[in-house]
Amino acid sequence: MSESKLAEQFLDAAIGLLQRVRDEDAEPIAAAGTLIADTVADGGRLFAFGAGHSSLAAQDLVYRAGGLALMNLLAVPGVVGVDVMPATLGSALERVDGLASAVLDSSPVRSGDVLVIISLSGRNALPVEMSMNARALGVKVIGVTSVAYASQTRSRHVSGTYLKDHCDIVLDSRIAVGDAELTLDTIEAPFAPASTVVTTALLQAVMATAAGTLADRGIEPPLLRSGNVDGGHDWNDRVMREYGDRIFYRR
């Protein structure tokens, strides 16, 4: 099979997943956008967390041109990405019981805030405990996961539960277990993951909804502009001064 044919198949698969998310997740997307708008309007703060490659979608929300300035990354050292050596350390830390409690205790997250937790499988201790503990603090949790994992894998948390079981709102990415969209007779393993594409788009749909909801209420959404357009830095400086008490990535 030609390389171009495989490229087309992957793009078709990704487009198909995006269409499913658009059609089947419309209700939770609207609910999540409304929750974020409510939180912004009520003086709450916004946080996003993801481990490993799930962190990419979280990072895409933070200090982002066209995004809400109030979204902060809840970072866990060694877990955020593949910048640690060995890269497998992050996967091991995701399975450590009690880590989420230590992270939340040392973070500015408090009652009335929103925490977006992204975990494709939703089966490891860190995202499960992060959601459980955050809700116990009075934090609203939006979980982004593939619900299919709950029926096709075993939870790695002592409770036997998954991220989806401890969220106020669940966004289902519809990614198949294994996160690989293509197979080929001449290649032993499935390949071409689409979770980052879909999860990132899903969350940007939520943020767009939040911005529109705020505008409908007569509230200017605290959006950032690109620093690479004229006037962008001045605009961002104004927004950050106005909302500085809710922005933690400048401290």
From Swiss-Prot:
One GO biological-process annotation of the entry reads:
carbohydrate derivative metabolic process
What sequence ranges are listed for the domain SIS? 36-220
Annotated GO molecular function terms are:
carbohydrate derivative binding
PROSITE patterns recorded: SIS
Q: Family per UniProt?
A: Belongs to the UPF0309 family.
- HAMAP family per UniProt: UPF0309 (MF_01240)
Q: What is this protein called?
A: UPF0309 protein SAV_3856
